Each structure stands twice: as structure tokens, then as C-alpha cells.
Amino acid sequence: MSKNHQDPPKAKSRSVSAKKKRRRRKKRQRRILMSITLILLFVIGFGSFYAYTMLSGINHDKISKNKTELGIYKENINALKKYKTYNKVINIALFGLDQRSENEPSRSDAVMIVSIDKANKKIKLTSVMRDSYVAIDGHGNDKLTHAYAYGGPELSIKTLNENFNLNITDYAAVNFFDMEKIIDSLGGVTLDIKQYEVKEINKYIKEIADITKTPYTPLAGAGSQTLTGRQALSYTRIRSVGNGDFERTSRQRIVLEALLGKIKEGGILSLPKNISKLAPMVRTSLGTGEMIKMGLSLFLSGTTEIETARIPVDGTFPDGGKMIKGTWYLPFDKEKNIEYLHEYIYEDVHPNK
């Protein structure tokens, strides 16, 4: 009987002991979580400081934050908000500038919309044809490329927003002559050169050599090969062979894609070195803090795929463009291209497939 009377206290003792163990385990888990949190905060803090140092060489430009001045209107924003992914996409204007000397005005030789799509884990590069016939505030209808010469990045952003009902508030720009240095600093890019492109590439290599008063070194021949910065830059400038300006914008996207691929290929350890090299050659309206936040967001979302497209879409403009008052333009069906562009950016429906 005495044994039976002693059983309940043993069960109670085991219960108390188990509770103590659970409390100790929870405390230990909390300590581990706190330690991990402190380590993460330290890494983020140190990483942010390091990132600020790396990005300090970038040239920052202030542009208007007034949405109306940038061509962003309430009715357009409301139309974009119907897309479920609206808050997961950031659109930035990217300009490739053709400025051969500091005293010469900049012209946007390449115009792209970079869409950071965290919903589909993609970076989308959409080329907008430079000769697209668009409305430019204060200048009537003209070629898209002229907006930058008329009013710099601010007017170019406004032109994109007003003609394509977008919400772009920031831009990044690279002078094509700096692009040569960027590509060389990364060890060149591998491209497949067609036979009919060789002569044209060498023509532009010669032109650049004459402008910069440097030796002329022509490309030897066609085929897959690693191009220097000057050779790759000359490749992007070809427009008189193949499918003219359409193929030219395709070449620009190919080089940019190869360049981004090269940076990715280097891995995270070589990223600081590469960013430090590239920073002085970039102009942007984005602040350093904004860029760090964007980069961290990209990293955490696992956004790695790069995809390209082109606007206007085939079938929405007259073949070969159109002469208007003695000048060649590319008029296009605006409503259809707005629809194609929005569906691509926000619904991941590729317009060129």
C-alpha cells in the first residue's frame, strides 16, 4: 500500500521536472534567437557601412519629386493599381548616353525601362525605340531620343510616363564611352558576332579611335568570342545592316545582359570590387540608402533572372517607319503598346513572344 501512496508524488515530480526542462529549453532558444538577431544586425550594419563606402563614387543628381512634374497622374496610378503585383514592381528609367565631350549636350542613344519584378523574381529590361514618335512636353511630337537633349533625365522620365502611363520616379545613366571602361574592367563580354556585323564594328572602332586619339585595333572576324569594351560598344552602335534600329536595340540589350551576367558570374565575393569600379561611371537620382535597400530587397527575394523585351511591339507600327515633314519617325499604336507594356511589367506576359 505504501508504494501505491508514493506513486503520485513521483508523477508530480516528473511533471515539474519536465516543465523546468521546457522552460530552460525556451530560454536557451530565446538566447540563440537573440544571438542570431544580434549577429544579423551587426552584419547588416557593417554591410550597410561597407555598401555606403562602395557606392560613394556614384554621381547623384537631384530631380523633381513632384509626381505631376514627372508626368505621373492619379488616373494612371489608379489604372496600374488594378494589377495585384503593383506594389512588388519598381520601374526605373535607364539611359545610355552619347556624349563625346564635356561641352557637348547629352543625347539618349538608348532608352530602357528596368522593371525589378519581385513577384516573378525577374529583372526586366524593356528597350523603347529611340525614334518612337512621342509627345514631349513643350516640344510637340518628336523622337523619344530628343527628350534627353531638350530637358535631361527629368523630361525624359516625364515623356516615358506620359506616353506609356507609367510611374517612373528615378533613373540611372551611363555614357557609352564609359561603358567601354566598365566592360574592360570586368574582363570583356562574350558575344556571337555575325559576319555582316564585322565590317560595321570595325567602322565604329575606327571612329572611336579617331575621337579618343588612340590606336585602331580592328576585330579579326565573326564567331563567338570575348570582346573588349571598345569592340562591344561598337557592336551596340550598328544600325545600317540587319534589321536596322530594331536589331540595334536588341544588341544593346544583349550587351547589357552579358554585362549583368558577368557581374553575377563573379559571385558575391567579387561584388564589392566590381561595384567600386562601376560606381564613378554611373549617374542616378537614387540615393545611396535607396540603392542599398533595393539591393537587399533583391537579395532577400531571390530575384536573379534577367529578361529583355522591346516596345513598340511588332505589328503596331508601319514597316520601315514613316517620313513626317522630311524626317524619319517611328509612329506606333499607343494604346496597344501601353497594354502590352503593362501586361509585361505587371502580369509577366512577354510582348515579343
Q: What residue spans do the PLM features occupy?
A:
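Entry/capping segment at the start of metal-dependent catalytic domains
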Residues: 2-8, 26-120, 313
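C-terminal solvent-exposed extensions
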Residues: 72-82, 88, 101, 135, ...
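N-terminal post-signal-peptidase region of extra-cytosolic proteins
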Residues: 75-81, 94-101, 107-112, 146-161, ...
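Extracytoplasmic
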Residues: 87-90, 106-111, 120-128, 139, ...
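Second-shell loop/turn segments in exported
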Residues: 99-103, 142-150, 165-170, 222, ...
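Extracytoplasmic/secreted envelope proteins and their assembly/folding machinery
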Residues: 108-110, 141, 145, 153-161, ...
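Amphipathic, coiled-coil-like alpha-helical scaffolding segments used for oligomerization/assembly
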Residues: 147-214, 287
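Flexible, polar/acidic helix-loop-strand segments at domain edges
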Residues: 184-270, 351-352
